[in-house]
Protein backbone atom coordinates (compact mmCIF):
# COMPACT_ATOMS: atom_id res chain seq x y z
CA UNK A 1 0.00 0.00 0.00
CA UNK A 2 1.07 3.58 -0.59
CA UNK A 3 1.85 6.02 2.21
CA UNK A 4 -1.40 7.85 1.43
CA UNK A 5 -3.38 4.62 1.74
CA UNK A 6 -1.74 3.87 5.08
CA UNK A 7 -2.46 7.39 6.33
CA UNK A 8 -6.12 7.04 5.33
CA UNK A 9 -6.32 3.67 7.06
CA UNK A 10 -4.72 5.21 10.15
CA UNK A 11 -7.36 7.96 10.16
CA UNK A 12 -10.15 5.41 9.85
CA UNK A 13 -8.69 3.29 12.65
CA UNK A 14 -8.65 6.35 14.91
CA UNK A 15 -12.33 6.96 14.09
CA UNK A 16 -13.20 3.34 14.88
CA UNK A 17 -11.32 3.37 18.18
CA UNK A 18 -12.88 6.72 19.14
CA UNK A 19 -16.35 5.33 18.49
CA UNK A 20 -15.58 2.21 20.51
CA UNK A 21 -14.30 4.35 23.40
CA UNK A 22 -17.52 6.40 23.27
CA UNK A 23 -19.45 3.13 23.52
CA UNK A 24 -17.57 2.14 26.66
CA UNK A 25 -14.39 0.35 25.53
CA UNK A 26 -11.66 1.07 28.07
CA UNK A 27 -8.61 2.00 26.02
CA UNK A 28 -6.70 5.03 24.81
CA UNK A 29 -6.13 6.27 21.29
CA UNK A 30 -2.83 4.77 20.15
CA UNK A 31 0.07 6.75 18.76
CA UNK A 32 0.85 5.94 15.15
CA UNK A 33 4.03 6.36 13.19
CA UNK A 34 3.83 5.79 9.45
CA UNK A 35 7.33 5.02 8.27
CA UNK A 36 7.60 5.91 4.60
CA UNK A 37 10.66 3.69 4.28
CA UNK A 38 9.01 0.61 5.72
CA UNK A 39 5.35 0.52 4.82
CA UNK A 40 5.14 -3.20 5.64
CA UNK A 41 6.11 -2.53 9.25
CA UNK A 42 3.73 0.43 9.30
CA UNK A 43 0.88 -1.80 8.16
CA UNK A 44 1.65 -4.30 10.93
CA UNK A 45 1.75 -1.44 13.42
CA UNK A 46 -1.74 -0.44 12.29
CA UNK A 47 -2.91 -4.06 12.55
CA UNK A 48 -1.84 -4.24 16.18
CA UNK A 49 -3.82 -1.12 17.10
CA UNK A 50 -7.23 -2.28 15.90
CA UNK A 51 -9.41 -4.13 18.40
CA UNK A 52 -10.39 -7.38 16.68
CA UNK A 53 -11.18 -10.97 17.38
CA UNK A 54 -8.54 -13.68 17.31
CA UNK A 55 -10.25 -15.08 14.22
CA UNK A 56 -9.77 -11.78 12.38
CA UNK A 57 -6.13 -11.58 13.47
CA UNK A 58 -5.55 -15.12 12.21
CA UNK A 59 -7.25 -14.24 8.94
CA UNK A 60 -4.84 -11.31 8.49
CA UNK A 61 -1.88 -13.54 9.29
CA UNK A 62 -3.00 -16.15 6.79
CA UNK A 63 -2.55 -13.83 3.81
CA UNK A 64 0.78 -14.18 2.02
CA UNK A 65 0.47 -10.90 0.15
CA UNK A 66 0.92 -7.57 1.93
CA UNK A 67 -1.65 -6.08 -0.44
CA UNK A 68 -4.16 -8.73 0.60
CA UNK A 69 -3.48 -7.98 4.26
CA UNK A 70 -3.97 -4.27 3.64
CA UNK A 71 -7.26 -4.88 1.81
CA UNK A 72 -8.52 -7.22 4.53
CA UNK A 73 -7.73 -4.74 7.30
CA UNK A 74 -9.14 -1.83 5.33
CA UNK A 75 -12.36 -3.74 4.61
CA UNK A 76 -12.67 -4.67 8.28
CA UNK A 77 -12.27 -1.05 9.39
CA UNK A 78 -14.74 0.16 6.75
CA UNK A 79 -17.28 -2.43 7.91
CA UNK A 80 -17.01 -1.21 11.50
CA UNK A 81 -17.40 2.41 10.38
CA UNK A 82 -20.50 1.58 8.34
CA UNK A 83 -22.09 -0.38 11.19
CA UNK A 84 -21.34 2.36 13.70
CA UNK A 85 -22.85 5.14 11.61
CA UNK A 86 -26.06 3.27 10.78
Tell where the protein language model's regions lie, with residue ranges.
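N-terminal low-complexity, acidic/polar interaction/targeting segments
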Residues: 1-86
Amino acid sequence: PSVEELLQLQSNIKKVISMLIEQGLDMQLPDFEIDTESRIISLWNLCTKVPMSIEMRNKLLSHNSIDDRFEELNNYVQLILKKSFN
